[in-house]
């Protein structure tokens, strides 16, 4: 059964910051479902697709333990409340880039997430999230730095540069701000993952399936997070997948490594000889003299060269005296990594055969 099912069994919004979904994935071969569910669960928990506040500058606060006049919360409590804020970005948000937000409120007032002035590409998931409380005739001024950290996303190719004069001057001013308070960010939008195995006795050889439950903070739906996680795993293994193994035909499994190394060596030699084909043909016509055809049968082993010299020549598929003669020594020295000292030794050995490669 090659086709696998990926279906959503249940999905509900249990709160403004609690999105729950349950999925069915399978069926799989025996003992494979546990492996796949464990890998997928770990990838989901390592998600980093959220956009969060990473640094804050509070007017009147020198450090995180400072007390703000007229504000019920301390600087530390204020940072913890800002850390809990959930934001969502649209497809025009640039990833791995900093954005800036601003807050200025006068008391008496209860400050919520809706009071923050955000960039036009970032929105608050829950605008009623509590931040602080200000008493009479007091004010609270904040400058916040938001960072979007997303390495794998379906919309990463749709990041357009916004030509807004207001955003240009606003970001230019805020980038020069010294943010003294740093927040430990949590870029994950996945709150919880639970996986279990379902046994199906009515399917032959395919008797295990995965029941996957995912809770997010509503910045992304669980389905999108799962698809992004699967895509990131596929891209990871494709980047280290070697297609050269496909062309290897093995007659004996004991010679697997040896045959693979020979295949790589032949492929490198093919590219080099194809690339320098014109150069070698030109040098062959220019320097070719009367050449005894019987010399084409002479192996380079009969030249009495050093073991290292023979190794360099054979590595580039130069096996006979004719193969050595038709390649210019400048090409040998420059592109085949054969040293000048080795070339001198080869020329001395070729003198007795009545030909020298110039």
Swiss-Prot record:
Gene3D superfamilies to which the protein is assigned, alphabetical: 5' to 3' exonuclease, C-terminal subdomain, DNA-directed RNA polymerase, insert domain, RNA polymerase, RBP11-like subunit
Intracellular or extracellular location(s): Plastid, Chloroplast
A biological-process GO annotation: DNA-templated transcription
Annotated stretches, region: Alpha N-terminal domain (alpha-NTD): 1-244
Main location: plastid
Catalytic reaction list: RNA(n) + a ribonucleoside 5'-triphosphate = RNA(n+1) + diphosphate
UniProt EC number: 2.7.7.6
Class of the enzyme per the UniProt entry, highest EC level: transferase
InterPro entries: DNA-dir_RNA_pol_insert, DNA-dir_RNA_pol_RpoA/D/Rpb3, RBP11-like, RNAP_asu_C, RNApol_insert_sf
GO cellular component labels: chloroplast; DNA-directed RNA polymerase complex; mitochondrion
Source domain of life: Eukaryota
Alphabetized UniProt keyword annotations: Chloroplast, DNA-directed RNA polymerase, Nucleotidyltransferase, Plastid, Transcription, Transferase
GO terms of molecular function: DNA binding; DNA-directed RNA polymerase activity; protein dimerization activity
Annotated S-S bridges: none
Region annotation Alpha C-terminal domain (alpha-CTD): where it falls in the sequence: 287-358
Family to which this protein belongs: Belongs to the RNA polymerase alpha chain family.
Role: DNA-dependent RNA polymerase catalyzes the transcription of DNA into RNA using the four ribonucleoside triphosphates as substrates.
Subunit structure comment from the entry: Homodimer. The RNAP catalytic core consists of 2 alpha, 1 beta, 1 beta' and 1 omega subunit. When a sigma factor is associated with the core the holoenzyme is formed, which can initiate transcription.
Entry domain remark: The N-terminal domain is essential for RNAP assembly and basal transcription, whereas the C-terminal domain is involved in interaction with transcriptional regulators and with upstream promoter elements.
Name this protein carries in UniProt: DNA-directed RNA polymerase subunit alpha
Organism for this UniProt entry: Bigelowiella natans
């Amino acid at each position: 059964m090659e086709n696998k099912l990926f279906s959503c069994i249940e999905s509900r919004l249990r709160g403004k910051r609690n999105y729950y979904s349950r999925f069915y994935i399978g069926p799989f071969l025996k003992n494979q479902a546990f492996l796949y569910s464990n890998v997928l669960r770990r990838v989901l928990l390592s998600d980093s697709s959220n956009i969060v506040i990473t640094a804050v500058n509070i007017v009147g606060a020198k450090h995180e333990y400072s007390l703000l006049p007229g504000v019920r919360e301390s600087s530390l409590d204020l940072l913890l409340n800002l850390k809990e804020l959930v934001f969502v970005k649209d497809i025009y948000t640039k990833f791995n880039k900093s954005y800036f937000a601003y807050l200025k409120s006068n008391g008496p007032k209860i400050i919520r997430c809706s009071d923050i002035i955000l960039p036009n590409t970032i929105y608050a998931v829950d605008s009623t999230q509590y931040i602080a409380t200000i008493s009479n005739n007091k004010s609270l001024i904040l400058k916040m730095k938001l960072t979007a950290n997303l390495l794998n996303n379906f919309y990463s190719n749709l990041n357009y540069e916004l030509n807004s004069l207001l955003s240009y001057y606003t970001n230019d001013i805020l980038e020069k701000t010294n943010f003294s308070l740093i927040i430990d960010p949590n870029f994950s939008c996945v709150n919880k993952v639970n996986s279990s195995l379902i046994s199906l006795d009515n399917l032959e050889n395919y008797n295990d399936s995965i029941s996957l439950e995912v809770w997010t903070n509503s910045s992304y739906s669980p389905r999108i997070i799962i698809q992004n996680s699967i895509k990131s795993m596929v891209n990871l293994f494709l980047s280290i997948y070697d297609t050269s193994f496909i062309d290897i035909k093995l007659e004996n499994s004991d010679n697997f490594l040896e045959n693979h190394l020979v295949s790589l060596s032949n492929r490198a030699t093919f590219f080099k000889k194809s690339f320098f084909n014109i150069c070698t043909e030109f040098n062959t016509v220019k320097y070719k003299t009367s050449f005894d055809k019987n010399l084409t049968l002479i192996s380079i082993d009969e030249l009495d060269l050093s073991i290292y010299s023979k190794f360099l020549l054979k590595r580039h598929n130069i096996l006979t005296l004719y193969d050595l003669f038709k390649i210019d020594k400048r090409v040998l020295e420059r592109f085949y990594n054969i040293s000048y000292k080795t070339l001198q030794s080869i020329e001395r050995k070729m003198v007795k055969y009545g030909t020298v490669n110039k």
